Amino acid sequence: GKEDNIMKLNCKRIDFTYIPGEEIFNFPEESGLPFLFDVEEELTGDPAAMDAVGEMLDEAEKLAEKAKAAIKAALADEDSRYHSVVTFFMEFHRDDVGPDIVAELFPGTDPAKLSFAEMVDFLKLKRFGSLVDSEMNQQVFILDLSFNPEITDELMVIYFDLNKEIFCITHES
């Protein structure tokens, strides 16, 4: 049966097993990771793809920091193709949600003086996923960043390619 084919993920941070050809979808309490972890079934049957997952998973927080740096750069550059999407995301969470929520989302700050760049530091990695991008026809990695999922379900979603380069930043809710 399928259970005979259990594979161990090649990563340092957790001891994780999976069944090739079956989707991985794990909440933090299941995996021991501090974020949601998911991999499309198309990839779990491919050992090379899963090696890439393990390697990227070990560096997830580094990738999140790279994502935050990219968001800050896009905020500062009006010519960036991501400028409007990241600016709207920050504006929404500072100016549209109401002062009580702002105080909860950004504890210890003065919302009146809070810059968008400072807000980026409050983003936390909530999901690390991998799937096959249909347009590129290659494996990609997706990081969901959120301020506080208990308060807001708005996400900054950052797509990385196999070279750990960002090729898309979107806002999802």
Each predicted region: which residue ranges?
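Long, contiguous N-terminal structural blocks used for assembly/anchoring
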Residues: N5-G108
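Compact soluble domain cores
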Residues: V86-M136
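Acidic, proline/glycine-rich low-complexity IDRs
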Residues: M7-I24, A117-S173
